[in-house]
Amino acid sequence: MSTNLRKTHPLAKIINSSFIDLPSPSNISAWWNFGSLLGACLILQTTTGIFLAMHYSPDISLAFSSVAHITRDVQYGWLIRNMHANGASLFFMCIYLHIGRGLYYGSYLYKETWYTGTTLLLLTMATAFVGYVLPWGQMSFWGATVITNLLSAIPYIGNTLVQWIWGGFSVDNATLTRFFAFHFLLPFAIMGLTMVHLLFLHETGSNNPTGLNSNTDKIPFHPYFSYKDLLGLTLMLALLLTLTLFSPNLLGDPDNFTPANPLSTPPHIKPEWYFLFAYAILRSIPNKLGGVLALMLSILVLFLMPTLHTSKQRTAQFRPLTQILFWSLIANLLVLTWIGGQPVENPFITIGQMASILHFSILLILMPIAGTIENKMLT
């Protein structure tokens, strides 16, 4: 009997065990599609990014005009640039939905997978931040100035640290050059960590909507989930192309069409939409160091999720109290996103402070309490 090359060849068998013969729970829903969509986003962003890097000049006198040159003179440069910019938005949409799925269905109990995933989120946020600086528009420059300046709140070493990151006494040519280097390098670190993320996932296998052990009911990844993922990919690409071709600047900031000017501050400095919730939490605390700590904790709180799980059941599928809290958390994050884009004046300040308190209360206090109450309701 001839052996199947797919199962014996050293390289092919890794691909086979990861994407073809991988035993998968038969009941995983469309919420399990986002992992593959994120992989597709990463490939898309890296590809478009490399093509952009071929024509971009990381120098303050050339950066803005080189981006204009890409969109005007390079063959399909407008498409590559707009797909890269809007691809980032789609990337974060998928990330947030992927994390939401993990929180709802208790996927965080696979600790190693969850921790590598949260680290991936931090790396992606860092990559997006340094990438936003590269076009060297007004919002690029002032965003870089404001966010890097937050590090000056660190006691004793703060100011030195900020100047070390800037490579001078202000955001200047040295800053742009190193940010370009980081923006080019970090996606490859993300790819490496993604491999580790998948390695840990395949140690345990996927979770499923019931949160129960699914070893008794597994089906092969191909053709069932490969085609399901392909459908998700088609829908995502349709959304991306619709956004890119019909309203490419919908999610961007008009200020970024003005070249960076250190002598003129834009009326409202704000980051891209996917950072607005964290920006709102940062602004809701009057103290600089307190704001920075709250900003960091708003993301780092994800590392605490496995520790804070008190329920006997894994998923929120059969836990009404936790469901109410989960959807309140989502609504609250949308409120924070809205507040992050508003000017610093009443009533926005008060709403932002309330929403920030609620954000941490739900995650750190109310959800563990709800889990304990639901355990009592079971007995």
Swiss-Prot record:
Note: Heme 1 (or BL or b562) is low-potential and absorbs at about 562 nm, and heme 2 (or BH or b566) is high-potential and absorbs at about 566 nm.
Topology with respect to the bilayer: Multi-pass membrane protein
Cofactor(s) it depends on: heme b
Residue positions binding heme b b566: H98, H197
Reported function: Component of the ubiquinol-cytochrome c reductase complex (complex III or cytochrome b-c1 complex) that is part of the mitochondrial respiratory chain. The b-c1 complex mediates electron transfer from ubiquinol to cytochrome c. Contributes to the generation of a proton gradient across the mitochondrial membrane that is then used for ATP synthesis.
Organism: Emydoidea blandingii (Blanding's turtle)
Gene: MT-CYB
GO cellular component, one term: respiratory chain complex III
Assembly notes: The cytochrome bc1 complex contains 3 respiratory subunits (MT-CYB, CYC1 and UQCRFS1), 2 core proteins (UQCRC1 and UQCRC2) and probably 6 low-molecular weight proteins.
Source organism phylogeny: Eukaryota, Metazoa, Chordata, Craniata, Vertebrata
Residues annotated for heme b b562 binding in this entry: H84, H183
An MF annotation (GO) of this entry: ubiquinol-cytochrome-c reductase activity
InterPro entries registered for this protein in UniProt: Cyt_b/b6_C, Cyt_b/b6_C_sf, Cyt_b/b6_N, Cytb/b6-like_sf, Cytochrome_b, Cytochrome_b_C_euk/bac, Cytochrome_b_N_euk/bac, Di-haem_cyt_TM
Gene Ontology terms describing biological process: mitochondrial electron transport, ubiquinol to cytochrome c
Compartments (UniProt record): Mitochondrion inner membrane
Name of the protein: Cytochrome b
Entry-linked PROSITE patterns: CYTB_CTER, CYTB_NTER
Protein family per UniProt: Belongs to the cytochrome b family.
Entry-linked SUPFAM superfamilies: a domain/subunit of cytochrome bc1 complex (Ubiquinol-cytochrome c reductase), Transmembrane di-heme cytochromes
Cofactor note: Binds 2 heme b groups non-covalently.
Residues annotated as transmembrane: 34-54, 78-99, 114-134, 179-199, 227-247, 289-309, 321-341, 348-368
Pfam families per record: Cytochrom_B_C, Cytochrome_B
Positions that bind a ubiquinone: H202
Keyword annotations: Electron transport, Heme, Iron, Membrane, Metal-binding, Mitochondrion, Mitochondrion inner membrane, Respiratory chain, Transmembrane, Transmembrane helix, Transport, Ubiquinone
